[in-house]
Amino acid sequence: MSTVTITDLARENVRNLTPYQSARRLGGNGDVWLNANEYPTAVEFQLTQQTLNRYPECQPKAVIENYAQYAGVKPEQVLVSRGADEGIELLIRAFCEPGKDSILYCPPTYGMYSVSAETIGVECRTVPTLDNWQLDLQGISDKLDGVKVVYVCSPNNPTGQLINPQDFRTLLELTRGKAIVVADEAYIEFCPQASLAGWLTEYPHLAILRTLSKAFALAGLRCGFTLANEEVINLLMKVIAPYPLSTPVADIAAQALSPQGIVAMRERVAQIIAEREYLIAALKEIPCVEQVFDSETNYILARFKASSAVFKSLWDQGIILRDQNKQPSLSGCLRITVGTREESQRVIDALRAEQV
């Protein structure tokens, strides 16, 4: 009689799953962490809620109302979750039948769309972006049959550019009555004029993902949002955990979304954008850098002459970047988070010392 192992008992798709390689999971012993698009310094908050003996609200009122006011939507159009990553998964769980429906996304892009779908047993379809990293609308149209959720990251991680708004409109018309279109706006604070939040009334099948991890400098808090019409939010409420936000998380999130919290966030954004432009200008003058791509975010994508050697050399010096070589159309590319001026200078000096 053959022995059944614990792994044998697991679902086949989980046995075969490659987990998302987060920046922390990839490790490294650096002192300059520029691989996770975090804000470089900690923001201090004081906990005001001491009722830790009680379960929290499922959707904390202060957080929802503050975020709705900030985003320019109604409170009924906001769902708060454990990071935007939970929002990605909730949309698949609410709208996709495992073994029947599919999601669609456009690489090179964020890796959690596929991991969430594969974990649940939902097929992934990909339509690579065009050479300018814009949507291949014809390719998407050809693959839409059976697709229930389409994920589009804008500005796109890791390329840093915005998706053409007219292409978004075309996609929303293509999918009307067929699929949910999810605009992942994790980095929208760095280009707020490009948000699609004002489109929700026009498109009942539009959902928007947001986070406090980037411009709000709260990656350790794990707090994200889904903006959508009330019908979508009500469906997501059926599949979300009963207490997604702990009391301390809700407490800090509400403070971060207060009027003074929003002002502080915008000051951070202005500082990061200024630092980004400084770093882009410096990178363009460095011999081992082949190309620096424009960015609307808090990170820069650049192509290097010997990216693997450069990545390892900086890693050995304690400067941790994100290797994008395995992504479609990104051979030779590394992604650099915009940090402090001191961190930028460390990167610049290390790259200038590279042999070409």
From Swiss-Prot:
Keywords of the record: Amino-acid biosynthesis, Aminotransferase, Histidine biosynthesis, Pyridoxal phosphate, Transferase
E.C. code: 2.6.1.9
Catalytic activity: L-histidinol phosphate + 2-oxoglutarate = 3-(imidazol-4-yl)-2-oxopropyl phosphate + L-glutamate
Annotated InterPro entries: Aminotrans_II_pyridoxalP_BS, Aminotransferase_I/II_large, HisP_aminotrans, PyrdxlP-dep_Trfase, PyrdxlP-dep_Trfase_major, PyrdxlP-dep_Trfase_small
This protein's record includes keyword ATP-binding: no
One Gene Ontology term of the molecular function aspect: histidinol-phosphate transaminase activity
Pathway involvement of the protein, from the record: Amino-acid biosynthesis; L-histidine biosynthesis; L-histidine from 5-phospho-alpha-D-ribose 1-diphosphate: step 7/9
Biological process per Gene Ontology, one example term: L-histidine biosynthetic process
N6-(pyridoxal phosphate)lysine modification, residue list: K214
Cofactors that this protein relies on: pyridoxal 5'-phosphate
Family: Belongs to the class-II pyridoxal-phosphate-dependent aminotransferase family. Histidinol-phosphate aminotransferase subfamily.
Assembly mode: Homodimer.
Protein name per Swiss-Prot or TrEMBL: Histidinol-phosphate aminotransferase
Organism of this sequence: Shigella boydii serotype 18 (strain CDC 3083-94 / BS512)
Organismal lineage: Bacteria, Pseudomonadati, Pseudomonadota, Gammaproteobacteria, Enterobacterales
Record gene name: hisC
